[in-house]
């Protein structure tokens, strides 16, 4: 009888130890997290890397809501989502403040650093003297980029709600370009596909883009296109930022992309908070993956495979994120 009691006690102790170990490995067990994302395949890669890490910590990741960046920020403010993986620190600052700012939200870590935006033209136009956005105040130079015959330069621009449209609209007025430049907005992939086709046909092109994104793997800065400078730094609402990159003023902040989460979620989930703090992905890895999407590997299964491949190639760093997150939950 005594031996039986001892055995039962040992078994109970082993079970408790196992339960404790499981809880330590899976601090998110029983918690469902609600991400919000933009509806663009090119942003799903880095988001799903974080989703996978959250799942490895025991969290259940709900199907993400797909909205534009401005609405994503508001979704956090209203409590309809817990976190957003594509907050540009400078570009989206207005959205951040409009959604409650530091009182309800927190920017966590730096998921991607060195993100760029800017205006570009084809190499032949650049070599012919169009090297600054301000040059387009000259009607003759602006006409070089007239795609529809109205005499105005056609700028392949930014989708409303992304944030970049505010900068472009501000600068067109600031630099006196309203009479010579038309900001074409709509579905970006359609607009840029037309731009790429026209450049391939030897036509002059003027467009906005950003990195990380696959476009710069097709229209390659320094090869077949060049970034334009701007006359001086001027951002909406009197904003200030470093807009210089490699000696050229691009007009947009040299930015970092962070996870944005609600204070309430971070306080309740220290493991997730630490994960967001330490997770970091090389921006070139995202550009490489985005090029795969552009080349046809664009299904959800393809993106999941890209995530698998990235995790295996970066296993030590990825496991380090999980270890730090688990330690934070103890």
Regions found by a protein language model. Name each.
Residues 252, 265-266, 273-274, 278-330:
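C-terminal functional modules
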Residues 21-34, 143-152, 318-330:
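Immediate post-signal peptide segment of exported/extracytoplasmic ligand-binding proteins
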Residues 40-41, 59-74, 183-194, 212:
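Short helix-initiation/N-cap motifs at beta->coil->alpha
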Residues 81-85, 159-234:
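Ligand-binding pocket segment of bilobal, Venus flytrap-like solute-binding proteins
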Residues 28-42, 59-65, 152-156, 276:
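Short, well-ordered beta-strand elements
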Residues 47, 64-103, 194, 214-220:
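Pocket-flanking alpha-helical
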């Amino acid at each position: 009888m005594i031996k039986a009691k001892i055995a039962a006690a040992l078994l109970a102790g082993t079970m408790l130890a196992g339960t404790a170990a499981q809880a330590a490995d899976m601090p998110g067990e029983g918690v469902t997290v609600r991400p919000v994302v933009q509806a663009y395949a090119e942003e799903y890669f880095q988001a799903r890397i974080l989703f996978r890490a959250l799942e490895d910590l025991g969290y259940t990741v709900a199907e993400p809501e797909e909205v534009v960046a401005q609405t994503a920020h508001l979704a956090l403010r209203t409590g309809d989502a817990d976190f957003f993986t594509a907050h540009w620190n400078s570009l989206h600052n207005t959205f951040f403040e409009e959604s409650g700012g530091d009182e309800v939200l927190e920017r966590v870590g730096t998921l991607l650093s060195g993100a760029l935006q800017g205006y570009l033209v084809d190499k032949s136009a650049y070599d012919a003297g169009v090297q600054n956005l301000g040059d387009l105040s000259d009607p003759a130079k602006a006409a070089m980029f007239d795609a529809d015959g109205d005499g105005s330069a056609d700028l392949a621009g930014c989708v409303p709600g992304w944030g970049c449209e505010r900068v472009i609209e501000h600068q067109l007025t600031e630099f006196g370009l309203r009479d010579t430049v038309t900001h074409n907005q709509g579905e970006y992939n359609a607009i840029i596909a037309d731009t790429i086709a026209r450049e391939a046909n030897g036509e002059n092109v003027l467009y906005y883009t950003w990195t990380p994104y696959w476009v710069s793997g097709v229209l390659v800065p320094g090869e077949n296109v060049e970034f334009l400078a701007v006359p001086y730094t001027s951002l909406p609402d009197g904003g200030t930022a470093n807009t210089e990159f490699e000696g050229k003023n691009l007009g947009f902040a040299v930015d970092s992309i962070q996870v944005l989460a609600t204070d309430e979620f971070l306080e309740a989930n220290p493991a997730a908070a630490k994960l967001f703090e330490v997770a970091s992905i090389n921006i070139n890895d995202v550009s490489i993956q985005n090029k795969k999407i552009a080349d046809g590997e664009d299904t959800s299964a393809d993106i999941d495979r890209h995530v698998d491949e990235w995790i295996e190639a970066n296993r030590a760093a990825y496991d380090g994120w999980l270890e730090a997150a688990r330690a934070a939950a103890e």
